[in-house]
Amino acid sequence: MGILDGESKKARVGMERQDERLRSLSEANDRLMAKNHALAKALTRATQELTKAKAQLNQLAGPPMTFATMIRVHAANTDEQGVQHASAEVISGTRRMIVPVAANVQASRLEAGRTVLLNENMVIVDQHDTDTLGSVRTVRQVLDDGRLLVADSGGNVTLVRRAGTLAKENVNTGDRVSVDSSVRFALTLIPVEDDADLVLEETPDVTFDDIGGLDEQIERIRDAVQMPFLHRELFERYDLKPPKGVLLYGPPGNGKTLIAKAVANALAEGSGAGSGVFLSVKGPELLNKFVGESERLIRMIFRRARERAADGRPVIVFIDEMDSLLRTRGSGVSSDVETTIVPQFLSELDGVESLDNVMVIGASNRIDMIDPAVLRPGRLDVKIRVERPKAKQAEQIIRHYLTDDLPLTPGIEAKALTSVLVADIYAVSEHRHLCDVCDEHGQWSPVYLADVVSGAVLKNVVDRAKTKAVKISIESAEPAAIGVNLLAKAVQEEFEETRDAVLDADPVQWSRINGFEAGHVTRIRPTAQ
């Protein structure tokens, strides 16, 4: 029994050791399997990173693609297996080439002017949309076959074809187009800029009765402008053609613009067309540094005038500061842009398209700077000088602004105040002595306020007095009367401002603008303050 018990005990111990060893081996196996899974995941991640790095490296190592402009399909055919074999003419930069077309790119869909993509073997592999960017050119002429003569800012003319998208659009002379880098194709039509701010269109309500002191000038312009419009049958009966244009010239601020507006209003009332049209243009605003832009604006103005006059309405094209726009060619005073602007203006004035119901009225302070071709008979052949108002005319002007309806000093009528005001302004005495001017002979002459007064100055004096009356009324809470004292203060302020403006004035320019003889004044000596 003892021997059996010992053997049984040994067997039990051996089995326990065997179980423990199996557990150890199982745990070791689990640990190895976990490590194997971790290594497998790490290997998978490494493989993915390696694949990604390889893809990035392949991308970085890829050859560059080249952009080119499509010109035309050179050749195209399909073999027995249905594979396309085609070539095309393209231009890249300055290189003009014939290159193959990839089989997956349909040659029939390649359009002239479109952007194509070339691979490293100079094979067309893709086609892009027409480039919307590029240099801008102005169309000078549209040829019968659709090609365009375009000019750059320097006036250099190039012959170009239209790109596929532009071939279907209506292109006219004066339009602007973008061109490709090779300047072989016109790509897109540039939208026309809104030039409405350059031309003020209005129906004037100014009448000749609103203008004072210019009876002689009004009569002359009525004879030149209003009579031909209102009595067309008589002019036709006597085979007499109305003037194409009128030039109003003289010192600034004396009613040139008012006269033009009154003419437009009078023509409208007498024509029975309902309303006249007054197109007001500022000469300097038409000047543009880009070649062809000023000419385009002039064409636009006359085209608009013809459109407005088509229904029988009289149209006045009023060009203010005409000397800045139509300066004498070759004068060298500016960049000589007038060498093209003047001919364009004259061609519109003399052109084959009639200017029925259209009258051009120009205004200028410097008639000596306007090109003589503009002033010759048959163009702006009626020239009316608008002089500075004398004392009698000044009374007529002031009566438009100083009326009996205003709160005046009791017992004093507007007519009496006007006489006092005019006497003060036109006084030839030391208290209205502005300056002395010296001519080319060294002779000094006095200049008084009356020598530089204008209709605008007279209105300004009355407005100053009215403003003072308003301020006094606000401070005192009672209506203040306009009287001799307020008018005298207004005249004194206007005199002092005018005298101060003379201090820094250039003698030659000041004398020309103020209507003195050209070149007559060489020096200005202001009076002591």
From Swiss-Prot:
GO CC list: proteasome complex
Coiled coil spans: 15-62
Gene3D superfamilies registered for this protein in UniProt: 1.10.8.60, Nucleic acid-binding proteins (2.40.50.140), P-loop containing nucleotide triphosphate hydrolases (3.40.50.300)
Keyword Aminoacyl-tRNA synthetase listed: no
GO molecular function: ATP binding; ATP hydrolysis activity
One GO term (biological process): modification-dependent protein catabolic process
Disulfide bonds: none
Lineage: superkingdom: Bacteria
Entry binding sites for ATP: G253, N254, G255, K256, T257, L258
Keywords linked to the UniProt accession: ATP-binding, Coiled coil, Nucleotide-binding
Keyword match Cytoplasm: no
Family membership: Belongs to the AAA ATPase family.
Quaternary structure and partners: Homohexamer. Assembles into a hexameric ring structure.
Protein known as: AAA ATPase forming ring-shaped complexes
Organism of derivation: Bifidobacterium dentium (strain ATCC 27534 / DSM 20436 / JCM 1195 / Bd1)
